[in-house]
């Protein structure tokens, strides 16, 4: 009985350690990435996994060492894993609709067709026109505040 308790405590500790490591990677990604879409990806995907691993580790620890099952931990686990991706999706969608800057690794626009509408045909002039319209929209939008 004592050996299984130690094994489960070790599993809980490893899950807590993995969750902390993934949260650190998420924080580095939030600081390092260039635009709102990459940052939201880093904030959502890895932090959701880190919270999942951390709460499962805490749940295992409480079950093994105290002998009770925490419904609060289970509910918080479900709540965070449902609301975090949905909330960040809404933030990214609002940023896209407001014309937020999208990071491109290089200036070659031949592979950027997914970011453009079909009538722009991936031309540099069309991208510049789109950026100019976006800047005019931003100036108009933020001057009224």
From Swiss-Prot:
Locations listed in the record: Cell membrane
InterPro entries in alphabetical order: PhaG_MnhG_YufB
Topology relative to the membrane: Multi-pass membrane protein
GO cellular component: plasma membrane
Molecular-function annotations in GO: sodium:proton antiporter activity
Alphabetical list of Pfam families matching this protein: PhaG_MnhG_YufB
Lineage top rank: taxon: Bacteria
Main subcellular location of this protein, as a coarse class: membrane
Spans through the membrane: 11-31, 51-71, 72-92
Keywords from the named record: Antiport, Cell membrane, Ion transport, Membrane, Transmembrane, Transmembrane helix, Transport
Subunit composition and interactions: May form a heterooligomeric complex that consists of seven subunits: mnhA2, mnhB2, mnhC2, mnhD2, mnhE2, mnhF2 and mnhG2.
Family named by the database record: Belongs to the CPA3 antiporters (TC 2.A.63) subunit G family.
PANTHER family tied to this protein: ANTIPORTER SUBUNIT MNHG2-RELATED
Alphabetical list of NCBIfam families matching this protein: CPA3_mnhG_phaG, PRK12586.1, PRK12674.1-2
Record's protein name: Putative antiporter subunit mnhG2
Organism (species): Staphylococcus aureus (strain MRSA252)
